[in-house]
Amino acid sequence: MTTAYAAAQTTEKKQSLAIIDSDVHPYMENGLATLVPYMSTAWQKRIGSGLGGGHTVASQFHLPLDYLYINSSGGMRADTARPGMSPATDPAFTAAQLLDGAGIDRAILLAGHLLGLGAMPDPQVAATIASAYNDWMCERWLQFDQRYRGGLVIAPQDPELAVKEIDRMSDRPGIVEIFMPLHEILMGEKHYYPIYEAAQRHGLPICVHPSGTENVYARAPRMAGTPTYYIEWHALLGQIHQANTASLLCHGVFERFPELKVVIAEGGIAWIAELAWKLDADWHGLRDEIPWVKRHPSDYLNENMRFTTQPFVEPPKREHLTSLMDMINAEKVLMFSSDYPHWNYNDPTNALAGLPEELQRRIMFDNPREFYGDRIN
């Protein structure tokens, strides 16, 4: 246990938490090479212990990411890096800038470099990387400052391996959820049922997030066509979340796993209302097709699913925002997220400005506290 971590334990605030940030991305200082010490010798050899040096096939191996769509300003805020380092690679700097600077009391970590892990073709390689990352995250971040909380990463390609990793990591201090990088298979399919059973058994929510590999890799999530520009791609990421939400609801996943909780991160929120209304209306006329869905789909959505705020909607007319919050039942289903250190970061001091104070408190604190339970404390 580090000195900083021990000190943080003794000086923990006694008052209520102010802000829980549901989407913060730590990055590995040397990319995949950072994880080499956390792999067996056999896996180091298979993946390529050089990882970036030389010109062998193994040394050129890299994690699936979007290298085709260009954000000319960069995907990261330049000020999120300590001089000489990359953004969000130093837990001390991030703690000073985000936790202290923005008043964040808990930050839930979602692996920045592993967002696209679900697109990797070899399930064993993906599972090995996920396992190594989890050990690194616990040692490098969770032990440094007790305000950090972790999403343990699983590789969705092989549910059996994913369940083993959930069982291995679920009781580690600071773990509050399972981060499941998205895959080509929609989330309602039976492929994921062993993962859902393990998540329910351990009382861990499952969080999904845009992968950064959409329409780029064969096994990545797919949009309805391939966008030309970054702005198109970025604006349409909600398509993936809408498809997965409908899949979860129509396949009756929450009837089969009534205690399962799912977090939909960084995919917009305005679509929640229309999708819920449409599914409820169609359910009345088409429920014979899906008899396992016993109640209105929106009932399951409101009880078992939560949605993070970033990128928060900014309608030209502010009064429309108030109406939207009511339409989507924001006082129950929304959880604040900053998306630190990305370029479209939402500052908690002004992201929800204009909303009633009680609603801000529910989104920033009460909703995630109730959803994550004792693990967040």
Label the predicted regions.
Residues 1-377:
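Helix-coil boundary/capping segments in enzymes
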